[in-house]
């Protein structure tokens, strides 16, 4: 599969480069589309899956039986695209439109360094982890701008909540990734996956020695994306839709798309940093060469990565259907008084485990 893609992509890349500056621009646009189109399609089916899963949990007839629950999500898309974008008369017109774009752009840009396989990555940057930290922290600026430009007290309150929440949990996520960097010895995402390779399968993954950091990163990822039970930014019972309260139509859809794209991105990153990425959990247990179509079961590949991502993406929905919303002060207390001290302690523990050879870097 990878060889087939490379045989197609490399000649195509050379052909575009032969066209001069215009070809370079077209190639850049093509790479942007290679990120945007799959993400948009994935979000569409993710919304369908969310409706189905919550429908099963809550025994809702619409998502379960009416048209097999497929048409509701697509009806929402058409409804949002064809609705008028209404702007409050007291809002800042330009900033009101720029805000959703500023939220969506980092959500798409972060995907450029995410590896799907050993060779299937758009940009195998040596500083991929630092780039991800930068991109994932930029989205909050769009939320703050939306709250300010709307000139609404509810929108502004939601934006301020989001700023405090993202800053709080960004620190915990960053400290959790410091442990990953120490254990892998790299900030390249592909090298982080290779550091978890070995003959013991999932026992070589960072999930076991870095389990507290895994929990911190997972929960912080849920808080970072403002999802239940950390959705005080859009608390319907308190501030309606938060920073999006004045948005409608396509502008609201951009916020919606950015949120779900970030949810899927966090699911990918958890799988890459702690669960071996595309590596098989039984890698090294079986060495027999049966057939190319069966070998991926123990040699690894993008299907394994997608299965791990599917689990964490479904967990987002499970949290939404099961847990009540935390109070704002509880969210802040969890981030500052529990997660940050825990990550600092476990960074030291990780350094000791690497020093004494408890954590062995992969092949």
From Swiss-Prot:
GO terms for biological process: aerobic respiration. It is a multi-pass membrane protein. PROSITE patterns: COMPLEX1_ND1_2 (PS00668). InterPro entries: NADH_UbQ_OxRdtase_su1/FPO (IPR001694), NADH_UbQ_OxRdtase_su1_CS (IPR018086). It comes from Xanthomonas campestris pv. campestris (strain B100). Its main location: membrane. The chain crosses the membrane at residues 29-49, 62-82, 96-116, 127-147, 163-183, 202-222, 239-257, 264-286, 299-319, 339-359. Pfam families: NADHdh. HAMAP family: NDH1_NuoH. This is NADH-quinone oxidoreductase subunit H. It catalyses: a quinone + NADH + 5 H(+)(in) = a quinol + NAD(+) + 4 H(+)(out). GO terms for molecular function: NADH dehydrogenase activity; oxidoreductase activity, acting on NAD(P)H, quinone or similar compound as acceptor; quinone binding.
